[in-house]
Amino acid sequence: MFDVSEAAYDKFMGRYSVRLAPVFADFAGIDAGQRVLDVGAGTGALAAELARRDAVVAAAEPAPTFVAALRARLLSVDVRQAAAEDLPWPDASFDAAVAQLVVTFMSDAPAGVAEMRRVVRPGGVVAVCMWDGDSMEMLGAVNRTQRTLDPSQPTPEQRTLYRSRETLEGLIGEGAQTELLEVESEYVRFEELWSTVIDGAGPAGVWAKSLDDEQRAAAREEMYRQVGSPSGAFTLVGRAWAVRTTRA
């Protein structure tokens, strides 16, 4: 699902995650000198923001292509190829563990969050965030396009878990604090957006790559309609639920 180049991921989702990273880091209360683990670091949007804050940063990422990109880009970060469910650090190694736009894609999210708790010291922070269903306008447009062309396609809630406040709070558990974060991304024209979907990562990219030429043309026209048939530059909004707790 994420077997794509760093450039393809960044064009599709990185443009949002780079903007989300400082807002999420503020929510998690990350300051200089803290030992912070970025779980599911991807191409490094959040890890780079944490490093800019002079935190002592480590990163776990399962995809080999992203691990290589992280190591090349963020020389000060301790990058390890690892899944969230099996983090290769001792107990209480960090002041905070954070996961941006990741928990939906963990093979076992409760186990992943339990591992985040394990590696955080007592009194430290565990924080996650995920897009809020269709209110992430770009993904919402993709999802509505899919369902318009094929009504048997699942809704965002059916397709992926942990895209609502309630499910994320349930995942984090007792003491959860929640905030809805908002970012924007600008596109110079519709073709810029459409090219990111065709080459993109995650479920949207898998779907786009499965289309034949006729289906792809129909999908393009429907998605153009879903984003308001823009004639020039336009902006899409992404909203994400962020949830944090303090380890007892």
Indicate residue ranges for each PLM-predicted region.
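A short SAM/SAH-binding and catalytic strip from SAM-dependent methyltransferases
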Residues: 95-109, 132
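Conserved catalytic/acceptor-binding region of the Class I
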Residues: 110-111, 117, 121-188, 204, ...
